[in-house]
């Protein structure tokens, strides 16, 4: 079935009318009227609980959203992705990061080739190499064991691997892993300052092997090895993860240490491919397979579960409701798990690079707001930073809480109890708020003066009725992390379907790159600053004058 544009417009119109009705978004009233609201508005998948009962929706809202999903042909486009059809239309590519998670005994034919065999072949090479590094049988040029890995990449070659490696710290039993992404020389300088060239291995992670930031950092690392160990050491201390095998070889990396991935794997979805080599080195191949298995479970759930019980689809519909219908311009990601402190930054790329688009699949301007601003921090830090804004700011920001029932430190369970209590409390406080009247009576009971109490009560009252979603799993493990990440991948894909955009390209990042290439020789004094705007000319002049001084 193709999208039904007429039915979609009617569904959108019905939703916009529905949101204006009295009490539709009154979460507190919904709970007072329905004792079964939590049961009706939550979904479970094994130990994963997806609770959206604190969103301003009713059963009627959900039905209208389901109608919208049907009109947009969410199920048909889901099938198109899983069958390998070209859904990245502007780049004419299939979108098959899901294939990277398939079991080894599956078959997936793309262009007359079983890509599962290709995937498993690269995975087997990753396993063999990681075991050699981890057991010490792979030696550096001087015969010493490799103790430190430096992953050089940016965007999807950095955000995912760095986040996952940090999140799975309790499972680390391999070499120390470091990440360099910025072209700011301070980044690689500070990392290398604490490392020994003889025991350091570099992973150059770049799909095209042309990304400026990555290649500049790789050259610095190459020179560092060359100056300390000699040119012959370069091939021993570097591996590459890339689609551009020839460019990696030209850089000086032996073909046996180049791990391939394919053009049907988008950068921000590449953690499941050889880009995840650094993760495997840190946690071992069995834990890495569990990571893939967790994502596979969510893939299966997304593929096979009916619409009304499908967590990624329901998650996406709520995101559409908040962004397009309610007009909330951002969403806050708040993991109450310190090891997921980098998860919001990872989701920023996954979400905003995917759905930060202004034209439809047909190349026409979109008439409603698309992807929201995605931001956040770990829960404990957030409470002492931006939660004031969430509770009393003039903008309503839906919050997505991520919580785990248990921690990895059983001797410190009392601290985890405090963490859980704070997460649940913030979710409840955002919804319930505190009225001026309640605050006033409390102040008066504490012996306050009437006029002063009345004024102070305005400052201390909270409107409440602020929506939030809660995602709870038992424990942060490779499996549960993989499942969580796949959930967000599919949610963002479905939101893109509802917005009628291509979630798998990123043309918006190209113009800045072009301008940077034009400006670099100007900054170096090699070219004149022709055809620049007045502001840029002024900035260039200031920088050049200050540099001379």
Swiss-Prot record:
Extent of the signal sequence: none
GO (cellular component) term, any one: cytosol
Annotated GO MF terms: carbohydrate derivative binding; glucose-6-phosphate isomerase activity; monosaccharide binding
Tree of life domain: Bacteria
Main subcellular location of this protein, as a coarse class: cytoplasm
Key words, A-Z: Cytoplasm, Gluconeogenesis, Glycolysis, Isomerase
TM region(s), chain numbering: none
Active site: 353 (proton donor), 384, 513
InterPro entries assigned to the protein according to its UniProt record, in alphabetical order: G6P_Isomerase, G6P_Isomerase_C, Phosphoglucose_isomerase_CS, SIS_dom_sf, SIS_PGI_1, SIS_PGI_2
Subcellular location: Cytoplasm
Its EC number(s): 5.3.1.9
Known function: Catalyzes the reversible isomerization of glucose-6-phosphate to fructose-6-phosphate.
Protein name as it appears in the record: Glucose-6-phosphate isomerase
Gene: pgi
């Amino acid at each position: 079935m193709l999208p039904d544009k007429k039915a979609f417009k009617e569904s959108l119109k019905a939703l916009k009318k529905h949101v204006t009705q009295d009490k539709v978004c009154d979460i507190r009233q919904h709970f007072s009227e329905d004792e079964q609201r939590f049961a009706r508005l939550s979904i479970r998948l094994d130990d994963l609980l997806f609770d959206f009962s604190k969103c301003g929706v009713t059963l009627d809202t959900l039905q209208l959203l389901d109608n919208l999903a049907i009109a947009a042909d969410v199920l048909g486009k889901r099938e198109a992705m899983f069958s390998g059809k070209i859904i990245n239309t502007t780049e004419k590519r299939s979108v098959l990061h899901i294939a990277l998670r398939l079991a080894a005994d599956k078959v997936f034919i793309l262009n007359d080739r079983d890509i599962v065999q290709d995937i498993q072949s690269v995975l087997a090479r990753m396993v063999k190499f990681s075991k050699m590094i981890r057991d010490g049988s792979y030696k550096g040029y001087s015969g010493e064991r490799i103790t430190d890995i430096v992953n050089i990449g940016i965007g999807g070659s950095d955000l995912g691997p760095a986040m996952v490696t940090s999140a799975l710290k309790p499972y680390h039993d391999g070499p120390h892993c470091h990440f360099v992404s910025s072209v700011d020389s301070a980044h690689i300088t500070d990392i290398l300052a604490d490392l020994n060239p003889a025991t350091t291995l570099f992973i150059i992670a770049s799909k095209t092997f042309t990304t400026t930031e990555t290649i500049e950092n790789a050259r610095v690392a190459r020179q560092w090895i060359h100056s300390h160990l000699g040119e012959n050491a370069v091939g021993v201390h570097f591996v590459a993860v890339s689609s551009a095998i020839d460019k990696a070889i030209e850089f000086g990396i032996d073909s046996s240490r180049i791990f391939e991935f394919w053009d049907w794997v988008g950068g921000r979805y590449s953690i499941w491919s050889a880009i995840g080599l650094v993760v495997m080195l840190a946690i071992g191949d069995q834990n890495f397979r569990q990571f893939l298995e967790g994502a596979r479970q969510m893939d299966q759930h997304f593929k096979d579960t009916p619409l009304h019980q499908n967590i990624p689809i329901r998650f996406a519909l709520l995101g559409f409701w908040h962004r397009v219908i309610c007009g909330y311009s951002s969403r806050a990601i708040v993991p109450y798990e310190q090891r997921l402190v980098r998860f919001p930054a990872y989701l920023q790329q996954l979400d905003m690079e995917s759905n930060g688009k202004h034209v439809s699949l047909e190349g026409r301007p979109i008439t409603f707001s698309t992807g929201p601003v995605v931001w956040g921090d770990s829960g404990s830090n957030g409470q002492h930073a931006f939660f004031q804004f969430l509770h009393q700011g003039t903008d309503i920001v839906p919050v997505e809480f991520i919580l785990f029932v248990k921690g990895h430190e059983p001797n410190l369970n009392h601290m985890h109890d405090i963490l859980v209590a704070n997460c649940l409390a913030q979710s409840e406080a955002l919804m319930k708020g505190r009225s001026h009247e309640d605050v006033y009576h409390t102040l008066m009971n504490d012996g306050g003066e009437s006029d002063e109490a009345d004024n102070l009560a305005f400052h201390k009252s909270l409107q409440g009725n602020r929506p939030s979603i809660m995602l709870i799993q038992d424990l942060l493990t490779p499996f549960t992390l993989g499942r969580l990440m796949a959930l967000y991948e599919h949610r963002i894909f479905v939101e893109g379907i509802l917005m009628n955009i291509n979630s798998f390209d990123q043309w918006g990042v190209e113009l800045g790159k072009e301008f940077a290439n034009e400006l670099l020789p100007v900054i170096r004094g090699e070219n004149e600053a022709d055809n620049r705007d007045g502001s840029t000319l002024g900035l260039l002049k200031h920088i050049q004058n200050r540099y001379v001084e």
